C-alpha cells in the first residue's frame, strides 16, 4: 500500500511538473521588431519572435524563431496584412518597389526550399498574389532550391535569384531572372541568365 502511494505521488508530481513546464513555455512573451520600411515610410513589417531562439549575434531573426509576420501602417502600427499563417519564416529582407505598391519576400520552407511571395497594394489594402511556382526550370533533377527576390527593376517587374542543387552530386546552378506581373497578378518571365554552374563537390 505504501509503495502504491509512493507511485501515485510520483506520478502526480511528474504531472504537475510537466504542466508547469507547458504553462511556462506558453507564457514566454514574444519580442517584436519593426523593420523593412516602405520607401514612402507609410508601411513596415513587424516580426513577432521567440527571443530564446535568437543566435548570440542577434543580428537576424531565424525563421524557426518567427511567430508572427504582419504588415503594419505607420505610425499607427495598425495591421494592414497578416501573413503569420504562411508556412515557414521570413528569409532575408522584404524588398519594396520604388512606388511602395509592391513588396516581395522569401519564405524558408525547411532546409531544402525557399520560395518567394509577392504582395500588391490596391488602394489602402495589400493583397497576396496567388502566384504559382515563382521560378524557372534550371535544367536538372533538383534536390534543393532557394528562390529569393533581389530588387524591383520597376514597379511590377521583379528581379530574382534561384539557386538549385541537383540530385546525385550533379552540381548546382544559379540563375537570375526577371518577371513581370500583369493586371490579374499572373507573372511572365521576361529575362533569365545563368550566372553560375558548378559541381557540388566544389562547395
Predicted regions and their residues:
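N-terminal secretory signal peptides that target proteins for export/translocation
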Residues: 1-7
